């Protein structure tokens, strides 16, 4: 079973994987029955999670077999639950590259006017290139755009586009892979071979690997940055049970 999951996750195109995830849900509760780990998003317990990631960034016991959440999804969910997100007044939400684990939840929230966007995802309402968003200025109260900026040619241009379509007083979360051992972002446009990109940037289709300067890059695009640190902002958090990355922070990008 583990071999089958790994093969599917690493070889199938994302749109097809999204469709097949509904089948995974039928198998997971039986194949991974247990209570060693817990996913706060689907609120299910399992014997273990699945492994995930490239050979360079491989992690064991991180992928929920039911809703396919990873460490970053579970951390974002914990932030949203402790904030006023689900109880706030009507929110215009733009969700770029919508994650399968969040899509059905956000879709049914009565306080969310929910718009999804992507290059090709079958989940998306809109399809566009993030470098030039075909929407007016000051439209959205909240924008989620997670694990996208490491894939784009000009991340600063994309950040300024996110800033442009966000309302004044709005906020967004744009998670990216971060090497917390590096002070600065590493990118080299001469590295084009997929294997070399995986070696340098942790994945074959990544164009850069962000460092601890990532929030400064968001500031350069105009955002004010607030930091959610689960170690200090959440009490009695069981990192091991939920299989979270103890170093990961959530940067909230605010348009003043």
Task: Please give the residue ranges for each predicted region.
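Local beta-strand N-terminus motif with an aromatic residue
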Residues: 90, 140-141
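Hydrophobic beta-strand segment of the Class I
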Residues: 96, 143-144
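S-adenosyl-L-methionine-dependent methyltransferase catalytic module, highlighting the catalytic core
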Residues: 3-6, 24-37, 153-163, 167, ...
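Alpha-helical membrane segments in multi-pass integral membrane proteins
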Residues: 142-143, 162
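Conserved N-terminal segment of class I S-adenosyl-L-methionine
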Residues: 2-134, 229-256
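Short catalytic micro-motifs in class I SAM-dependent methyltransferases
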Residues: 147-151
């Amino acid at each position: 079973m583990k071999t089958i999951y790994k093969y599917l996750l690493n070889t199938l195109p994302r749109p097809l994987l999204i469709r097949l995830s509904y089948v995974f849900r039928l198998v997971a509760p039986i194949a991974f029955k247990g209570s060693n780990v817990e996913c706060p998003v689907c609120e299910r317990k399992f014997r273990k999670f699945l492994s995930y990631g490239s050979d360079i960034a491989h992690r064991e016991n991180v992928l929920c077999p039911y809703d396919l959440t990873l460490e970053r999804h579970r951390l974002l969910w914990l932030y949203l639950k402790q904030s006023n997100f689900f109880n706030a007044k009507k929110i215009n939400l733009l969700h770029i590259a919508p994650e399968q684990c969040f899509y059905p939840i956000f879709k049914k929230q009565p306080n969310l006017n929910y718009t999804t966007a992507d290059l090709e995802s079958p989940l998306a309402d809109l399809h566009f290139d993030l470098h030039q968003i075909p929407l007016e200025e000051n439209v959205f109260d909240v924008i989620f755009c997670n694990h996208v900026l490491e894939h784009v040619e000009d991340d600063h241009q994309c950040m300024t586009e996110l800033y442009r379509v966000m309302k004044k007083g709005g906020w967004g979360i744009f998670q990216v892979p971060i090497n917390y051992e590096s002070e600065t972002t590493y990118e080299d446009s001469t590295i084009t071979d997929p294997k070399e990109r995986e070696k340098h940037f942790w994945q074959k289709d990544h164009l850069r690997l962000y460092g601890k300067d990532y929030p400064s890059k968001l500031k350069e695009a105009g955002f004010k940055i607030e930091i959610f640190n689960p170690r200090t902002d959440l009490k009695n958090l069981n990192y091991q049970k939920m299989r979270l990355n103890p170093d990961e922070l959530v940067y909230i990008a605010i348009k003043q």
